[in-house]
Amino acid sequence: MKETIFTGAAVALVTPFNPDMSVNYEELEKLIEFQITSGTDAIVTCGTTGEAATLTDEEHVKVIEFTVNKVAGRVPVIAGTGSNDTAYAVELSQKAEALGANGLLLVTPYYNKTSPRGLVASFNRIAGSVKIPCIVYNVPSRTGLNILPETYYELSKTQNIVATKEANHDISALIKTRELCGDDLTVYSGEDTQTLPIASLGGKGVISTFSNIMPKEMHELATASVAGDLKTAQALTFKYLDLMNALFMDVNPIPVKQALNLMGFNCGHCRLPLADMSDEQIAKLKVEMAKHLQLA
């Protein structure tokens, strides 16, 4: 049985920007403190929600370093270092390890998507270049590449490929993956709304967008789900479902950044090609947020 990096809810943290679109490190520190004091179980930096795709190489490394330093060992820090260029992913992963990241999040190759054989070779090359645990990330709606249960089985043989962030919405495939891999591959939900269903199949939590705005509540939902407290987990899922879905009425992380701004944080805008929400969308988001949160 492999060691689990975290159990519960890890926040897929946004990257705040200044008006000139540079990284707002002062606000990033505030977000980190908000997460830790609210009970988040881990912090994922430079993932999809962190707009890693539009960070420069220098920014990417600096955000990882800043996050590790400010967290200061209070919760695990997982750095997004995946790429469709395996050599670059190796380089970035080694830098993240040297900076003190506790684990890596590795998205599947995208655009130049590969075969299952190539996927295993790529992930094994990256994992073999570091000693810290790696979480692979399956999000075919973005990458055009889906990890099959049989491929997961091959990946689970690699010692430091310890988990997957699963966002393919295929419960049947997940059941097969759990059957094949057992405790050699931890499963985390990659969708807030799927936390309870995936936990019922042995999942250990969620890497969450929703945690950006309600970390305490997402921690409680994930913890109840993993513990098998069905009554509590169901009640919390039902309670927050509409707000979770509202955070995806536009391309992630556009709505969640807007939500944080409405809460009084200063996260700024997303970098292009991600454009601001429409006034109509913002109005709908406010309605859902007002049911649970105090708006600025």
PLM segments and residue spans:
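C-terminal alpha-helical cap/extension of soluble enzyme domains
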Residues: 5-16, 38-40, 200-203, 207-296
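Catalytic alpha/beta core domains of metabolic enzymes, predominantly
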Residues: 128, 142-248
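Active-site beta->alpha loop and helix N-cap motifs at the rims of alpha/beta catalytic domains
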Residues: 2-11, 15-144
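A general structural signal for well-ordered alpha-helical segments in protein cores
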Residues: 28, 60, 64, 89, ...
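Alpha-helical structural signal in soluble globular domains
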Residues: 62, 66-71, 95, 99, ...
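Glycine-rich phosphate-binding "P-loop"
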Residues: 138, 160-161, 271-272
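Alpha-helix N-capping/helix-start residues
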Residues: 19, 25, 57, 149, ...
